[in-house]
């Protein structure tokens, strides 16, 4: 299987040596479950796309510092690409954080900066609905998060299958072809911590401190990798 990674941002230059690019993170995360997966990378901020959707078996949209409600031209192009994939429904599509939000917005949902403020650290989501590909079974799971924007209203064909009081729409599906996560299963805890430290001045101290403490636990990245691989291969 070949996964097309649609890169929507760059890792800060001083962190690349330790953590790699966002595509590197995605590849390492998924290859712990499927070493034979192949990957192609597309810098969609620079309007670089596959010449044809058939180039890859599935696509994944990464996280980004951008907001989905900005009006940059590359966002409009990517939104149309999302709709094209969804309408064809022959390719699986995965969204992470920004990718999760942009897919929701592109398909008719609503995203904006939440009045609840920052979500940072390890966030636990409760499973509302268990899908067949969610093996091993789990009632809840934890993933790194760092976001202010979040999904406020789902598209009519979408279903929230996991969430929490702070972020009710943490995981969303659209039939059998689209799966999106607000959390970052591809992020190491140390990368989340590095991003938090860079943004400490714009967070409330209590939120920042609680987020750091939460990183004492371990994320369920491998569990979610199993789920995503099952979803892609079903």
Outline where the language-model segments fall.
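Amide-donor transfer/coupling interface in amidating biosynthetic enzymes
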Residues: 2-8, 12-15, 25, 87, ...
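Cysteine-nucleophile active-site neighborhood
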Residues: 62-131
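Conserved beta-strand termini and adjacent loop/short-helix elements that scaffold enzyme active sites
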Residues: 42-44, 114, 146, 163
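Short, polar loop motifs at secondary-structure junctions
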Residues: 32, 45-46, 99, 148-150, ...
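N-terminal beta1-alpha1 cap of cysteine-dependent amidohydrolase-like domains
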Residues: 1-73, 77-87, 209-234
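A short acidic, often aromatic-flanked loop/helix-cap motif at beta-alpha or helix-coil junctions
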Residues: 46-50, 119-120, 152, 168-169
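Short, glycine/charged-enriched secondary-structure capping and boundary segments
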Residues: 18-21, 54-56, 73-76, 107-111, ...
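Conserved beta-strand segments of alpha/beta enzyme cores
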Residues: 38-40, 110, 142, 159
């Amino acid at each position: 299987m070949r996964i097309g990674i649609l890169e929507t941002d760059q890792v800060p230059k001083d962190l690349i040596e330790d953590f790699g690019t966002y595509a590197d993170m995605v590849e390492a995360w998924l290859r712990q479950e499927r070493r034979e997966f192949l990957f192609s990378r597309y810098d969609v901020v620079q309007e670089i796309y596959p010449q044809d959707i058939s180039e890859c078996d599935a696509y994944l949209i990464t996280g980004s510092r951008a907001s989905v409600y900005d009006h940059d031209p590359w966002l409009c192009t990517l939104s149309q690409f999302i709709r094209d994939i969804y309408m064809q429904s022959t390719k699986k599509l995965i969204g992470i954080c920004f990718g999760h939000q942009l897919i929701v917005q592109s398909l008719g949902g609503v995203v904006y900066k939440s009045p609840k403020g920052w979500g940072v650290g390890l966030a636990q989501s409760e499973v509302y609905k268990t899908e067949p590909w969610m093996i091993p079974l789990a009632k809840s799971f934890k993933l790194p998060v760092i976001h202010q924007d979040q999904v406020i209203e789902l598209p009519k064909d979408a279903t929230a299958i996991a969430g929490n009081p702070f972020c009710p729409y943490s995981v969303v599906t659209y039939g059998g072809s689209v799966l999106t996560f607000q959390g970052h299963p591809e992020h190491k805890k140390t990368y989340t911590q590095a991003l938090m430290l860079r943004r400490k001045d714009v967070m409330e101290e209590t939120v920042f401190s609680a987020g750091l403490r939460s990183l004492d636990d371990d994320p369920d990245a491998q569990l979610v990798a199993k789920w995503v691989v099952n979803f892609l291969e079903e």
